[in-house]
């Protein structure tokens, strides 16, 4: 019997097809090897090498990095307090008004029996301690003199912060610490006098209270008792041996704090003279052909640099004394004098004080006026206005009388939208009162009074408005801005196309193009701009000077053309600090700062308000404009400095190379200056676009499926046709455009991407570029000394009114 063949199952046409595994279509290892053909990626190769380091090699690398950091710290310590290095500069900060700094200084004087103690006319105490092989200079600014403290802290190596056993740190002490933190805090040591005189039970409680308050700002610091000479010796050792902090804006530039100050007038009738500042040079090398800056007074040139003998040497034996200055060639003006001239200025190589560009009128695209037109404009500006006024009328009263023949001038381009709207309302009231004035002309006897056009400025200078009412108006305006941001009412008596002639519509604020070089103001022809700012900064910072005074030398700097008002307002005990400028740092450009409003500041700060800036080593006043701190090419203008978020302040100012800390102060009516914001330098960029937004609003009159009739946005047919290309949006998220005008009273038909709600509002966004005003002023007056912080000069009634004004809007 034959064996039957084995049958196997054969799939039919209806076989189930399972889906293939979705592996993401990644290439296999073999496919990648075939494509690369043995080549290895550079990143992978370096990564393998890093991972293949042996344990001993990694340990050796860590030890080398640790040794390098330790050597850097030791090198900084060796650069202070030695024989050929400047003394360790210490600033005593009284954090409570009841602290007697004289007791602290007396204890430091007797810290070491072998120490040599000297004190100069500027109030700087010098201690030469052979035991530690260190020199220490101690300066104590007056309590309440904030500028003296900030200027001294700019060049300080260490702050000796004195706290009390009662309040530890008072309100003014907290204010000083906030300013010092914003400016750049050097190393700090906390001491307390009178701690050991407390009962033993109270010492533990007081110690906990002090440590808790200190740890809020300085978590790693502890306070030291300073009651005996032994305590003082430990404090001096702590001052000279602790790690120093880096403050880059100071360490990158040469700086001198005045040990001796003298002033010589150029001649008896001159308003300027030569200021001689003698002190230890710190930081970098100082060249006489560079410029120096005096905080609060501006930039100056130098005539020469002298090298007198060091009056506070560490080695007191004349035979063993070695002058580092003798390594260079110097000439002496007098053979019997110890003063040697290090360097004299070379007029051919000396840096110029020109901070602005002289614009060429023929280089601009606009037509420049002729000399006849300029002369005519000047005569028009000086022209007197003759009015008929009643007899006995003063100049002040005559300025308020409206002349029927006087033409109503247009609003200035620099005025804000709110000011222009207020002017339009006031104009209507003036027109109604003008008729009543003309009716009484025949009944009143008149005389002719000549009034200059600048009477308004005279009136403003003599005006003394109530500060509480100003604050109330600002609070109202800020609240309205928060509730209805950037919304502007369209004027009914002025065409919108002329009212918003400088504005433009943007399809997208983020992506729409905007040329930063178009329609620039005339002030932009006076400023400087770098092709590559970062590269210029790197070149200026890394530049080494072969000639000049070296850090650590005791020098006398002759500063030329210093105003006589400087020495007239100078008070002994206030520090005089000189900072050498890097190349290009005296040239004016557009400077941007990122600042944040202080949490305890309640009053609104409007854009274009006068503020006082402390930027690194500079101090000046300006009227900044605020804008949002965002990414992109365009940044929205802010009418007020917001609370809780960072904002960019833009001003015309001399160029500064970052990093530089920023302190912003606002002057009060009583001459005090309050800290309102802190921040840092952002950039120097004239091409940064700050766009102001104006939002026109309209309301639906009739609503269809996708179209609606909108009114109250415009009031004539021509304005609707003019703004027809601009996109519309609503508060509820609809988008649309103008289709056609209806009638002659401002109604228009608009089409949207969906049906509108009856309670919705139609908005149109318009933008114009904003520029800061040229209000830079390097001369800043020193504020009054605060005897008790936070009291001011207000009466109790004024305080009650101010509190009521704030409560209305909280």
Language-model-detected regions and their locations in the chain:
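Short acidic, S/G/P-rich loop/turn micro-motifs used as interaction or catalytic elements
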Residues: 98-100, 165-170, 195-199
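Alpha-helical interaction elements in eukaryotic regulators
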Residues: 100, 104, 145, 152-155, ...
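Inter-motif core of Ras-like GTPase G domains
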Residues: 142-167, 173-189
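Conserved NTP-handling cores and scaffolds of large molecular machines
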Residues: 112, 163, 214, 218, ...
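Short beta-strand/turn micro-motifs composed of small residues
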Residues: 94, 163, 191-194
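Canonical P-loop GTPase G-domain recognition
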Residues: 181-189, 194-284, 288-293
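C-terminal effector/interaction modules appended to NTPase cores
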Residues: 2-146, 150-157, 267-810
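A generic secondary-structure signal
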Residues: 107-111, 178-179, 213
């Amino acid at each position: 019997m034959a064996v039957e063949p084995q049958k196997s199952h054969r799939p039919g046409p209806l076989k189930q097809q399972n889906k293939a595994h979705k592996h993401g279509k990644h290439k296999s290892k073999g496919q990648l090897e075939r494509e690369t053909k043995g080549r290895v990626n550079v990143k992978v190769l370096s990564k393998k090498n890093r991972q293949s380091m042996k344990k001993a090699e990694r340990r050796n690398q860590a030890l080398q990095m640790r040794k390098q950091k330790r050597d850097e710290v030791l090198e900084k310590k060796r650069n202070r307090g030695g024989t050929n290095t400047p003394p360790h500069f210490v600033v005593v900060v009284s954090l409570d008004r009841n602290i007697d700094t004289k007791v602290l200084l007396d204890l430091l004087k007797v810290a070491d029996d072998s120490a040599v103690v000297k004190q100069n006319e500027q109030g700087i105490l010098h201690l030469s301690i052979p035991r530690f092989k260190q020199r220490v200079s101690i300066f104590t600014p007056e309590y309440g003199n904030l500028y003296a403290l900030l200027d001294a802290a700019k060049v300080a190596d260490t702050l000796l912060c004195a706290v009390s056993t009662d309040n530890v740190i008072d309100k003014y002490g907290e204010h000083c610490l906030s300013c010092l933190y914003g400016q750049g805090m050097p190393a700090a040591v906390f001491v307390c006098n009178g701690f050991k005189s407390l009962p033993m039970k109270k010492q533990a409680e007081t110690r906990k209270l002090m440590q808790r308050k200190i740890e809020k700002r300085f978590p790693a610091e502890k306070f030291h008792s300073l009651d005996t000479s032994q305590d003082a010796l430990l404090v001096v050792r702590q001052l000279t041996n602790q790690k120093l902090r880096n403050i880059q804006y100071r360490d990158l530039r040469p700086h001198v704090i005045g040990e001796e100050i003298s002033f010589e007038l150029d001649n008896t009738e001159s308003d300027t003279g030569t200021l001689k500042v003698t002190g230890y040079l710190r930081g970098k090398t100082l060249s006489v052909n560079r410029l120096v800056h005096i905080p609060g007074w501006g930039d100056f040139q130098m005539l020469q640099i002298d090298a007198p003998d060091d009056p506070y040497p560490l080695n007191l034996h004349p035979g063993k004394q070695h002058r580092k200055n003798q390594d260079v060639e110097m000439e002496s003006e007098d053979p019997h004098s110890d003063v040697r001239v290090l360097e004299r200025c070379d007029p051919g190589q000396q840096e110029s004080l020109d901070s602005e560009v002289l614009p060429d009128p023929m280089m601009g695209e606009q037509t420049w006026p002729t000399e006849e037109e300029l002369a005519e404009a000047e005569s028009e500006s000086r022209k007197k206005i003759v009015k008929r006024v009643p007899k006995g009328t003063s100049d002040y009263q005559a300025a308020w009388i409206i002349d029927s023949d006087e033409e109503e001038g247009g609003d200035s381009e620099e005025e804000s939208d709110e000011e222009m709207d207020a002017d339009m309302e006031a104009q209507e009231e003036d027109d109604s009162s003008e008729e009543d004035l003309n009716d009484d002309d025949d009944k009143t006897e008149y005389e002719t009074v000549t009034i200059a056009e600048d009477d308004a400025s005279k009136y403003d200078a003599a005006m003394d408005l109530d500060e509480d009412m100003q604050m109330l108006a600002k609070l109202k305006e800020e609240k309205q801005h928060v509730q209805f941001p950037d919304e502007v009412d369209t004027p009914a008596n002025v065409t919108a196309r002329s009212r918003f002639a400088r504005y433009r519509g943007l399809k997208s604020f983020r992506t729409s193009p905007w040329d930063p070089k178009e329609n620039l103001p005339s002030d932009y022809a006076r400023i400087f701009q770098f092709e590559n700012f970062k590269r210029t900064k790197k070149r200026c910072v890394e530049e080494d000077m072969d000639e000049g005074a070296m850090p650590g030398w005791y020098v006398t700097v002759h500063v030329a053309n210093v105003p006589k008002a400087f020495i007239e307002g100078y008070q002994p005990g206030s520090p005089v600090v000189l900072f050498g400028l890097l190349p290009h740092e005296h040239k004016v450009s557009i400077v941007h700062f990122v600042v944040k409003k202080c949490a305890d500041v309640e009053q609104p700060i409007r854009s274009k308000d006068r503020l006082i800036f402390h930027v690194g080593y500079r101090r000046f006043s300006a009227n900044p404009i605020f804008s949002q701190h965002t990414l992109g090419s365009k940044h929205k203008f802010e009418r007020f400095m917001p609370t809780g978020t960072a904002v960019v302040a833009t001003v015309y100012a001399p160029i500064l190379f970052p990093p530089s800390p920023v302190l912003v102060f606002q002057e009060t009516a009583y001459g005090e200056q309050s800290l309102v914001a802190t921040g840092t330098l952002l950039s120097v960029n004239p091409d940064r676009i700050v766009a102001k937004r104006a939002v026109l609003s309209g309301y639906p009159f009739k609503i269809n499926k996708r179209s609606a009739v909108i009114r109250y946005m415009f009031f004539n047919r021509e304005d609707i046709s003019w703004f027809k290309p601009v996109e519309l949006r609503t508060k509820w998220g609809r988008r649309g455009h103008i289709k056609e005008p209806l009638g002659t009273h401002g109604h228009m038909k608009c089409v949207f991407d969906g049906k509108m709600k009856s309670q919705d509002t139609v908005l149109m966004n318009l933008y114009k570029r904003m520029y800061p005003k040229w209000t830079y002023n390097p001369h800043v007056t020193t504020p009054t000394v605060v005897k008790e912080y936070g009291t001011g000069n207000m009466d109790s009634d004024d305080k009650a009114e101010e509190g009521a004004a704030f409560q209305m809007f909280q």
